[in-house]
Amino acid sequence: MLLLLVLLIGASGINAVVYKEVPIQANTDTLEYVHTVWRHGDRTPAELLFPDDITKWPEGLGELTEQGAAQQYRLGQWLKRRYGSWLGEKFNRNAIYIRSSDYNRTLMSAQANMAGLFPPKYPIAGGLMWQPIPVHTISKPTDKELYEEASCPTAEIEMNAQWKSTKANGIRKKFARELSFFSQKLNLPNMELKATWRIFDNLFCEKQNNITWPSWMNSSIFERVDQLYNEVSQLEFHTDTLRRLRGGTLLEEIFHRFSDKASGSLGKEAKFYAYSAHDSTIAALLATLGVFYDIYPKYATCLLIEMHKLANETRLIRVFHKNETDIDRLIEYSIPGCDDPCTLQKLGDDLKKYFPEDWEAECGLKTSFQFIYLVIISILVISTVCSCTMLFVEKQKRKILRFPVDGLRDDTAPMLGGDDSD
C-alpha cells in the first residue's frame, strides 16, 4: 500500500499532509456511520468575462450541465461500489439523508448521484422505472454550513485582511506577469487577486465543454492560471478565524451526529448522511481538519468521513478523499493532531476550538439584531406611553363642570354622565 508524505504551505508554516492510497471497497465489518460531502458536477460559469459570452451557455449561469449530471450519476455508482452491500439495494429513508445547498446545480447533482447509487430495480405504479429520493435544503441566508457566502462580517473582515497579507503579496509577485497579461486583455487596470477565480472559472468551463478560447489564450497560459487559482484559493481558510467561522459549523454538525449515533440517540437504522455542496465546502472542511491540499476540489469529487465501531465500543474516525473526477483513486488522510487510530473523543477534543459557541455572535450579526430588537421595543414602549397619555387627557376632558339640574342635582353632578359611562 502506497504511503505518501506531501509538504504543503498551511496556516503557520509547513504542514505535513500524510495520506495513503486505499481500496475502493469499504471495511463494512466495523463501519457504523458515514458522512460524505461532494462537489456538484460540471457547471456553466458563475459570472462572465465578456457579456456576449452568454450565448455560449443556454442553460444560464452557474447551472449544472448535462456532462455534470452524468459525472454525478457516475459518482453515485462509485459510492454504490464502496457502500452498496452495506446500504442495500433500495433507498431507506430511516438510514439515509441527503442535504443540499440551495442551488439548482447542487440539488440536481444530488438527484443524479442518488440515481446512480440507488437505481430502480422494479417499476413503480404506471410502469415507471424510477426510485424517487428526497433531497432536503434550507434557504441560503440561514445555511451557515453549506452556503459559502453566508453573511458573516467577522469572516469577511478577516478575508479582506488576507488579500493584504504577506502570503498574498508573495502570490502577486510570483504571478506578476500573468496578472499584468490579464489586466491588459480584460481591460482591468487594477487587477486584484480576488478576480482570478472568475478568469479561471470561465476558461475552465470553456475547456470542459469544448468551447473555443479567445485567440490570446492557450494551454500553457491556462496551466499558469490553474496554478494561480489554486494558490489564491488557499487564502480562503488560511487563519483559525476563517476555519472556525467557515468550516467549523459543518465539522461541528458532523461531530455531534457521530456522537448521537454512538450514544444511540440517532437510531439503529441511521447510516449515511450526504451533503451536496461546493468546492469551498470541501476545502473548508479539510482545512479545519488540518489538511491543506494543494489542488482545489474538482467537479463530482467527494470527501468521506467514516465512523467505525470496534469490539470494545471505541469509535474510530477515518477520512477519505476521492479527489479526481471519474477516476477510481481513493486516498485516506492521517488527521494532524489525532493519533492513528483517531478516536471520536480525541477528534472532538482536538477540534472543538473550531466549533463556534454562538456563530451569529462571533460573526458580529447578533449586535445588529439586538440593536433592531431594542429599537422595536423602544418604539412599542413610547407608543404605549403616548396612547395612555392620550387616553388620560381624553378622560379628563370628559370630566364635566358640575351644575344643578331642575334643582334636583347638586353641584357635584356631572354634565354628561358619571364614571360608569366611561
From Swiss-Prot:
Key word Hydrolase present: yes
Pfam families: His_Phos_2
InterPro entries tied to this protein: Acid_Pase_AS, His_Pase_clade-2, His_PPase_superfam, Histidine_acid_phosphatase
UniProt KW keywords: Disulfide bond, Glycoprotein, Hydrolase, Signal
PROSITE patterns: HIS_ACID_PHOSPHAT_1, HIS_ACID_PHOSPHAT_2
Residues listed as glycosylation sites in the UniProt record: N104, N210, N218, N312, N323
EC supergroup of this enzyme: hydrolase
One of the record's GO molecular function terms: acid phosphatase activity
Reactions catalysed, as given in the entry: a phosphate monoester + H2O = an alcohol + phosphate
Record CDD domains: HP_HAP_like
Stretch forming the signal peptide: 1-13
Cystine residue pairs: C152-C363, C205-C302, C338-C342
EC number(s) reported in the record: 3.1.3.2
Active site: H40, D279
Family to which the UniProt record says this protein belongs: Belongs to the histidine acid phosphatase family.
Protein name as annotated: Putative acid phosphatase 5
Species name: Caenorhabditis elegans
Chain's gene name: pho-5
